Protein backbone atom coordinates (compact mmCIF):
# COMPACT_ATOMS: atom_id res chain seq x y z
CA UNK A 1 0.00 0.00 0.00
CA UNK A 2 1.33 3.43 -0.96
CA UNK A 3 2.14 5.71 1.97
CA UNK A 4 0.22 8.99 1.80
CA UNK A 5 2.26 12.14 2.23
CA UNK A 6 1.05 15.42 3.60
CA UNK A 7 -1.42 16.40 6.27
CA UNK A 8 -5.00 15.11 6.27
CA UNK A 9 -7.61 17.87 5.92
CA UNK A 10 -11.38 18.16 5.86
CA UNK A 11 -12.66 20.92 3.61
CA UNK A 12 -16.20 22.29 3.70
CA UNK A 13 -17.37 24.04 0.53
CA UNK A 14 -20.61 25.90 -0.19
CA UNK A 15 -21.44 26.57 -3.83
CA UNK A 16 -24.04 28.94 -5.26
CA UNK A 17 -27.50 27.52 -5.98
CA UNK A 18 -27.62 29.55 -9.20
CA UNK A 19 -25.23 27.06 -10.81
CA UNK A 20 -26.61 24.40 -13.12
CA UNK A 21 -25.78 20.80 -12.24
CA UNK A 22 -23.06 20.77 -14.91
CA UNK A 23 -21.59 24.10 -13.74
CA UNK A 24 -21.63 22.89 -10.12
CA UNK A 25 -19.80 19.71 -11.13
CA UNK A 26 -17.17 21.81 -12.94
CA UNK A 27 -16.81 24.13 -9.93
CA UNK A 28 -16.27 21.13 -7.65
CA UNK A 29 -13.77 19.71 -10.16
CA UNK A 30 -11.91 23.04 -10.03
CA UNK A 31 -11.55 22.65 -6.25
CA UNK A 32 -10.41 19.02 -6.44
CA UNK A 33 -7.99 19.68 -9.31
CA UNK A 34 -6.49 22.52 -7.26
CA UNK A 35 -5.75 20.00 -4.52
CA UNK A 36 -4.11 17.54 -6.90
CA UNK A 37 -2.19 20.33 -8.69
CA UNK A 38 -0.40 21.04 -5.40
CA UNK A 39 0.56 17.40 -4.99
CA UNK A 40 -2.42 16.44 -2.84
CA UNK A 41 -4.80 13.53 -3.05
CA UNK A 42 -8.60 13.65 -2.75
CA UNK A 43 -9.68 10.76 -0.52
CA UNK A 44 -13.45 11.21 -0.09
CA UNK A 45 -16.16 13.62 -1.27
CA UNK A 46 -19.46 13.92 0.61
CA UNK A 47 -22.25 15.66 -1.34
CA UNK A 48 -24.64 17.06 1.27
CA UNK A 49 -26.97 18.66 -1.27
CA UNK A 50 -28.85 21.93 -1.15
CA UNK A 51 -29.26 23.42 2.32
CA UNK A 52 -30.37 26.67 3.90
CA UNK A 53 -27.55 29.01 4.95
CA UNK A 54 -27.37 30.36 8.50
CA UNK A 55 -27.20 33.88 7.06
CA UNK A 56 -27.28 35.56 3.66
CA UNK A 57 -24.04 35.33 1.68
CA UNK A 58 -23.81 37.54 -1.41
CA UNK A 59 -27.61 37.61 -1.54
CA UNK A 60 -27.94 33.82 -1.34
CA UNK A 61 -30.08 32.10 1.32
CA UNK A 62 -29.18 28.53 0.23
CA UNK A 63 -26.12 26.72 -1.03
CA UNK A 64 -24.86 23.32 -2.17
CA UNK A 65 -22.66 21.77 0.51
CA UNK A 66 -19.69 19.46 -0.10
CA UNK A 67 -17.21 18.02 2.38
CA UNK A 68 -13.90 16.81 0.97
CA UNK A 69 -11.23 14.80 2.77
CA UNK A 70 -7.81 15.25 1.22
CA UNK A 71 -4.09 15.14 1.91
CA UNK A 72 -1.70 17.87 0.85
CA UNK A 73 1.48 19.49 2.13
CA UNK A 74 0.68 22.14 4.77
CA UNK A 75 2.51 24.77 2.68
CA UNK A 76 -0.06 24.32 -0.12
CA UNK A 77 -3.05 25.38 2.01
CA UNK A 78 -2.35 29.12 1.62
CA UNK A 79 -2.23 28.73 -2.17
CA UNK A 80 -5.46 26.73 -2.18
CA UNK A 81 -7.18 29.43 -0.09
CA UNK A 82 -5.98 32.08 -2.55
CA UNK A 83 -7.57 30.10 -5.39
CA UNK A 84 -10.78 29.63 -3.40
CA UNK A 85 -11.09 33.39 -2.82
CA UNK A 86 -10.91 33.92 -6.59
CA UNK A 87 -13.60 31.31 -7.31
CA UNK A 88 -16.87 33.26 -7.74
CA UNK A 89 -18.98 30.08 -7.60
CA UNK A 90 -17.72 29.27 -4.10
CA UNK A 91 -19.76 31.15 -1.47
CA UNK A 92 -17.82 29.90 1.57
CA UNK A 93 -15.10 27.42 2.43
CA UNK A 94 -13.38 26.16 5.53
CA UNK A 95 -10.37 23.87 5.87
CA UNK A 96 -9.59 21.97 9.06
CA UNK A 97 -6.95 19.43 10.00
CA UNK A 98 -8.57 16.01 10.31
CA UNK A 99 -7.53 12.95 12.27
CA UNK A 100 -9.41 10.44 10.10
CA UNK A 101 -11.59 10.23 7.01
CA UNK A 102 -15.26 9.94 7.93
CA UNK A 103 -17.03 7.49 5.65
CA UNK A 104 -20.49 8.74 6.69
CA UNK A 105 -21.35 12.26 7.82
CA UNK A 106 -24.22 12.70 10.25
CA UNK A 107 -25.71 16.05 11.19
CA UNK A 108 -28.26 16.76 13.89
CA UNK A 109 -31.50 18.36 12.73
CA UNK A 110 -31.92 21.87 14.09
CA UNK A 111 -35.32 23.18 15.19
CA UNK A 112 -36.82 25.79 12.88
Curated annotation (Swiss-Prot):
Belongs to the bacterial ribosomal protein bS6 family. Binds together with bS18 to 16S ribosomal RNA. One of its GO terms (biological process) is translation. This is Small ribosomal subunit protein bS6. GO terms for molecular function: small ribosomal subunit rRNA binding; structural constituent of ribosome. CDD domains: bS6 (cd00473). Keywords: Ribonucleoprotein, Ribosomal protein, RNA-binding, rRNA-binding. The keyword Transcription regulation does not apply. Pfam families: Ribosomal_S6 (PF01250). It comes from Chlamydia trachomatis serovar D (strain ATCC VR-885 / DSM 19411 / UW-3/Cx). GO terms for cellular component: cytoplasm; ribonucleoprotein complex; ribosome.
Amino acid sequence: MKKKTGQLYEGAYVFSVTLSEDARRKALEKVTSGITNYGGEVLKIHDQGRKKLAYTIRGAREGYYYFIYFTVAPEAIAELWREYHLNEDLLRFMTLKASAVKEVLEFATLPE
